[in-house]
């Protein structure tokens, strides 16, 4: 459950962020993702719920199930007591991989998912009160994509 206060009115929005916690906890998936990031090579199937994208990019049932509706849901994800720290940790680990392109480390199409996810969260964190929160996501953009955000994600956020 997340509370949003647009124009001074209280609105309660249920983003069902627990779907991400359940997916990450299932079978130790998040721990496996961390181990893969530390090894410098992604092998498992966890991108959708560790590095989620904005809705409108993926067309598979899994991509749609784990898509974020926009900046408000991305901010709620960042503020979540489990998901926010995990996302930042995963982004830090991704940025710290010593060698390899995004395609070499993540494979295709997960390299595209990574770019769109960190673009979304850099924008969500950068528009919050603490702009420093975006640094971990821009570090991933710098490391793999010459600092260039994903244009399709930016278009969907407009």
Where do the PLM segments sit?
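Extreme N-terminal tail/first-helix region
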Residues: 2-31
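Short helix-capping/linker segments at secondary-structure and domain boundaries
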Residues: 56-62, 123-136
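Mid-chain, well-packed structural core segment of small domains
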Residues: 76-125
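C-terminal end-helix/capping segment
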Residues: 12, 64-86, 148-151
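Charged phosphate-binding loop/patch that engages nucleotide di/tri-phosphates or the phosphate backbone
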Residues: 127-158
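N-terminal targeting/disorder module
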Residues: 14, 19-21, 117, 121, ...
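Short amphipathic alpha-helical segments and their helix-coil junctions
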Residues: 22-36, 95-102
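Hydrophobic/aromatic-rich, well-ordered segments within soluble, folded domains that form packed cores
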Residues: 36-71
């Amino acid at each position: 459950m997340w509370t949003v206060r647009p124009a001074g009115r209280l609105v309660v929005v249920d983003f069902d962020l627990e779907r991400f916690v359940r997916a990450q906890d299932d079978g130790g998936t998040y721990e496996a993702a961390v181990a893969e990031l530390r090894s410098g090579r992604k092998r498992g199937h966890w991108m959708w719920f560790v590095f989620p994208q904005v809705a409108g990019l993926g067309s598979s049932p899994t991509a749609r199930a784990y898509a974020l509706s926009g900046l408000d849901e991305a901010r709620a994800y960042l503020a979540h007591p489990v998901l926010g720290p995990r996302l930042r940790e995963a982004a830090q680990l991704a940025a710290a991989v010593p060698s390899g392109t995004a395609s070499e480390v993540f494979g295709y199409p997960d390299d595209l998912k990574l770019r769109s996810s960190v673009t979304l969260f850099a924008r969500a964190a950068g528009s919050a009160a603490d702009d420093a929160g975006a640094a971990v996501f821009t570090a991933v953009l710098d490391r793999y994509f010459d600092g260039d955000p994903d244009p399709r994600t930016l278009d969907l956020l407009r």
